[in-house]
Amino acid sequence: MTTRLSMEIQGVPYDNIEKTIAFLGEHGLMTGGTGAKVRPVVSCKGTTCQYGLIDTFALSKKIHERFYVGYHDVVLPHKFKIAVGGCPNNCVKPNLNDMGIIGQRIPKPDSEKCRGCKKCQIEKSCPVHVPKLVDGKLYIDPEECIHCGRCKGKCPFGAVPEY
């Protein structure tokens, strides 16, 4: 297995390469992903993870069909890597790829629903402690928020809705 979760077959004699490619194709396996081409798309487990915010499998499949399969015969200036991460935790390192997608949720507090609880569940749920009660109302600094989505649905009064 490679770091991009592909199989690498070593030791195939040069004169058997075409036969090997044909054999793999007959069994539903694609070859490629080497050289100056789009490499296989990688993704995290997405919504099956407790932190997953987007369906990485569905998105990766669309990207795979469009770019890996669709650009299979296109020679690029260099290898092109794509990764899809389901949240800002960065498990598959989308920001280190040529194209990276990171699932995010931007909270939009509803000040009408905030009751200024002394033990605010939104404050408690944030891993970077961004939400604060200011004058008895919830405030989330948009510049400091990491958009991890852990606050969604935590307020029993709906001050931060499920989006």
Question: Where on the chain are the PLM-derived regions?
Answer:
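Ferredoxin-like iron-sulfur electron-transfer modules
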Residues: K45-T48, F67-H72, L76-K79, G100-G153, ...
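Small-residue-enriched alpha-helical segments and adjacent helix-cap loops
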Residues: M1-P107, K113-G116
